[in-house]
């Protein structure tokens, strides 16, 4: 086994696809990466809440009162009253009848998809969906048809031509994590109605960022009351904490409690995390200026990059990719940016399609206009050095 896996590691290295862990300590708009302070353009901490003192104090208070860990799964003796408080806050925020917290976005997607989708169902999935959605669909053992990214015409054609099934599912990210573009939810809802399907939306990168009170993209488009729509969200990005959730009707939550294996067979979240989650939900609603600032900074950053000639794809969110192409050039650009004090990571296949390696930048409300302008100057210089722009 050692020889075989060592050969594979060497292959990845030759293709500039080998990854490594780097020591990182993030605080506000800054990250100390391998001992060097840098402007953090690689974080999903969109609203700058990860080191907000109110989340920290809520977590510390809960840890002092209730201990460091849950000690059991939710269905045994790990369902702490703080779960009820956080889920009640979720229901109020999302205007939902019921809510259920999972340990992470990955386990939420795996758990929900495998619990609800069966072998006799058909799934229609955007080709650029997150790995957790892809894995959940695979584990469900349902037949899956992948449609080209955002290609509504192809999706409708697949729905029309598909064989009879117990249930049809359309599965999509709300905001695509490597491209920064938004799912055409209004058109997907129309197809869901027309072909009597269920729409499952992963709001990981849209929760806290879009919607009147940061509820997400479904609320942004006024689709939150639509029937046969399931929304999954996370606490680990804009909300600055950890964990994930599903919101919907009571029967859905009750069914998941009894069937979602990733919920049933894992230790519950620590009380400190649950307390921070509840605090974050209230802050997101009470401080809309964080979202306003985030969108203004994102627009400033994206506009400046486009004017310089960079390809930012279809980005319309705080996630702004610069498409580079070859893996080695993306790695070289990332290294040059880090030398200049900008933390930005090269994203390569299989995370993105072959030939589309990129630097994935993400903007946060913790940044300033000066941070944005300095970053753009550094990106321009790095882009010129690798021949990406003239």
Curated annotation (Swiss-Prot):
Ubl conjugation listed as a keyword: no
What is this enzyme's catalytic activity, as reactions? 6-carboxyhexanoyl-[ACP] + L-alanine + H(+) = (8S)-8-amino-7-oxononanoate + holo-[ACP] + CO2
* Functional pathway: Cofactor biosynthesis; biotin biosynthesis
A biological process from GO: biotin biosynthetic process
Superkingdom of source: Bacteria
Where is substrate annotated to bind?
19, 130, 351
Reported cofactor(s): pyridoxal 5'-phosphate
Modified residue annotations for N6-(pyridoxal phosphate)lysine: 237
Tell me any Pfam family this protein matches.
Aminotran_1_2
Question: What are the EC numbers?
Answer: 2.3.1.47
What does the UniProt keyword field contain? Biotin biosynthesis, Pyridoxal phosphate, Transferase
InterPro entries, per the entry: Aminotrans_II_pyridoxalP_BS (IPR001917), Aminotransferase_I/II_large (IPR004839), AON_synthase_class-II (IPR050087), AONS_Archaea/Proteobacteria (IPR004723), PyrdxlP-dep_Trfase (IPR015424), PyrdxlP-dep_Trfase_major (IPR015421), PyrdxlP-dep_Trfase_small (IPR015422)
Q: Name one GO molecular function term.
A: pyridoxal phosphate binding
Q: Where does pyridoxal 5'-phosphate bind?
A: 105-106, 177, 202-205, 234-237
Question: Which family does the record claim for this protein?
Answer: Belongs to the class-II pyridoxal-phosphate-dependent aminotransferase family. BioF subfamily.
Q: What does this protein do?
A: Catalyzes the decarboxylative condensation of pimeloyl-[acyl-carrier protein] and L-alanine to produce 8-amino-7-oxononanoate (AON), [acyl-carrier protein], and carbon dioxide.
Q: How does it assemble?
A: Homodimer.
According to UniProt, the name of this protein is Putative 8-amino-7-oxononanoate synthase
Species per Swiss-Prot/TrEMBL record: Geobacillus kaustophilus (strain HTA426)
Traced from the root, the source organism's taxonomic lineage reads:
Bacteria, Bacillati, Bacillota, Bacilli, Bacillales
Per the record, the gene is bioF
């Amino acid at each position: 086994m050692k020889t075989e896996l060592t050969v594979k590691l060497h292959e990845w290295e030759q293709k500039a696809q080998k990854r490594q862990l780097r020591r990182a300590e993030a605080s506000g708009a800054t990250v100390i990466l391998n001992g060097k302070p840098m402007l953090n353009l690689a974080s999903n901490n969109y609203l700058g809440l990860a080191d907000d003192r109110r989340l920290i104090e809520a977590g510390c208070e809960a840890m002092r009162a209730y201990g460091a860990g849950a000690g059991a799964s939710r269905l045994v003796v790990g369902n702490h009253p703080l779960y009820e408080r956080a889920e009640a806050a979720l229901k109020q925020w999302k205007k939902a009848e019921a809510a259920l917290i999972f340990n992470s976005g990955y386990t939420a997607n795996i758990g929900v998809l495998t619990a609800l989708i069966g072998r006799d169902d058909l799934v229609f999935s955007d080709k650029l969906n997150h790995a957790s959605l892809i894995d959940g669909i695979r584990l469900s053992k349902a037949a899956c048809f992948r449609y080209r990214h955002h290609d509504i015409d192809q999706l409708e054609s697949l729905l029309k031509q598909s064989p009879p099934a117990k249930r049809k599912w359309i599965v999509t990210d709300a905001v695509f994590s490597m491209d920064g573009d938004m799912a055409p939810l209004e058109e997907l809802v129309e197809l869901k109605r027309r072909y009597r399907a269920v729409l499952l939306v992963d709001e990981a990168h849209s929760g806290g960022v879009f919607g009147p009170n940061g509820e997400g993209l479904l609320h942004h488009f006024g689709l939150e009351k639509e029937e046969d729509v399931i929304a999954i969200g996370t606490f680990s990005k804009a909300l600055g904490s950890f964990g994930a959730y599903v919101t919907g009707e009571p029967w859905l939550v009750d069914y998941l409690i009894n069937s979602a294996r990733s919920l049933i067979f894992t230790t519950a979240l620590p009380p400190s995390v649950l307390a921070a989650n509840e605090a974050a939900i209230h802050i997101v609603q009470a401080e809309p200026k964080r979202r306003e600032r985030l969108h203004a900074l994102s627009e400033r950053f994206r506009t400046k990059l486009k004017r310089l000639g960079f390809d930012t794809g279809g980005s319309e969110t705080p996630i702004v990719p610069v498409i580079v192409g070859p893996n080695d050039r993306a790695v070289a650009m990332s290294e040059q940016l880090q030398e200049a004090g900008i933390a930005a990571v090269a994203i390569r296949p299989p995370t993105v399609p072959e030939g589309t390696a990129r630097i994935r930048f993400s903007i946060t409300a913790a940044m300033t206009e000066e941070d944005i302008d300095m970053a753009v100057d550094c990106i321009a210089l790095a882009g010129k050095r690798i021949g990406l722009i003239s």
